[in-house]
């Protein structure tokens, strides 16, 4: 009887919730690079913590977001040299992967990519048993940042929408921003509160806003908030790779 193979591909962000031990580790997960010079290269390391060899391949994609924070990706192999692009990592061993940016050097704003390490499934022994083979993909984030680039987050509007508030933000700067550690101060007649930490991150979802990008964040309207005249002040707390 032929072995029936089921594949389950899990992104790294879901592993903790799946209750499955990591087959391997990738570091770093987020890093900044320059468009040219020595800083246009970086190294990520793939550590095989499994008891068996793993086969990997590395893929580059451009990362984009719409105003709701929904992510999309575009192939970007022409913007990078990845070495080695494929490989076998033995148990307990670490494979270094060099990332060389070779895209446009004259950037007027930062560009964000994912460099994804994909585990390639292998054939299971033909022992007559069925099973599930889990393969893990780790998407690291590579930001190509021109010299002197800065994020500038502006509050465009705060609009009541039933029991919610629609907060519209715009990045008027020329560098990406990660909004995860930031907060929003709401104030009105006889009322003030700060939305931060888990409440903010839950409403935010995807935390990235790219240069020139707009984000619309739906906030739960506080019970004691006035019906009119509510003002929002966004406080950017930047994270460092």
Listing of model-derived features with the role each one plays in the protein:
Residues 1-10:
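Bacterial N-terminal signal peptides that target proteins for export
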Residues 16-21:
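N-terminal signal peptide c-region/cleavage motif recognized by signal peptidases
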Residues 23-50, 86, 148-164, 168-170, ...:
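Beta-sheet-dominated interaction scaffolds and their linkers
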Residues 51-74, 174-193, 236-238:
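Short acidic, flexible loop segments centered on an aromatic residue
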Residues 61-63, 94, 100-104, 118-120, ...:
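Solvent-exposed coil/turn segments that connect beta secondary-structure elements
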Residues 71-105, 193-225:
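Intrinsically disordered, low-complexity Pro/Gly/Ser/Thr-rich segments with frequent PxxP/GP/PP motifs
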Residues 102-152, 223-241:
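Terminal connector regions
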Residues 121-194:
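A charged, solvent-exposed segment within the mature domains of Sec-exported extracytoplasmic proteins
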């Amino acid at each position: 009887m032929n072995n029936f193979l089921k594949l389950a591909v899990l992104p790294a962000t879901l592993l903790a919730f799946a209750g499955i031990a990591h087959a391997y580790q990738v570091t770093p997960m987020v890093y900044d690079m320059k468009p040219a010079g020595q800083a246009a290269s970086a190294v990520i390391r793939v550590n095989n913590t499994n008891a068996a060899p793993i086969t990997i391949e590395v893929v580059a994609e451009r990362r984009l977001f719409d105003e709701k924070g929904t992510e999309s990706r575009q192939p970007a192999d022409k913007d990078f040299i990845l070495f080695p692009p494929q490989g076998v990592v033995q148990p307990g061993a670490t494979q270094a992967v060099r990332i060389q940016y070779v895209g446009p050097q004259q950037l007027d704003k930062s560009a964000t990519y994912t460099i994804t390490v994909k585990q390639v499934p292998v054939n299971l022994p033909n022992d007559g048993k069925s099973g599930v083979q889990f393969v893990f993909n780790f998407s690291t984030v590579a930001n190509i940042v021109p010299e002197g680039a800065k994020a500038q987050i502006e509050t465009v509007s705060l609009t009541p929408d039933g029991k919610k508030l629609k907060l519209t933000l715009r990045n008027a700067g020329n560098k990406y921003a990660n909004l995860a550690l930031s907060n929003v101060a709401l104030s009105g007649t006889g009322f003030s509160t700060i939305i931060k930490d888990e409440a903010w991150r839950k409403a935010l979802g995807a935390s990235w806003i790219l240069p020139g990008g707009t984000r619309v964040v739906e906030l739960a309207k506080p019970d004691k908030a006035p019906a009119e005249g509510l003002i929002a002040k966004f406080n950017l707390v930047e994270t460092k790779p």
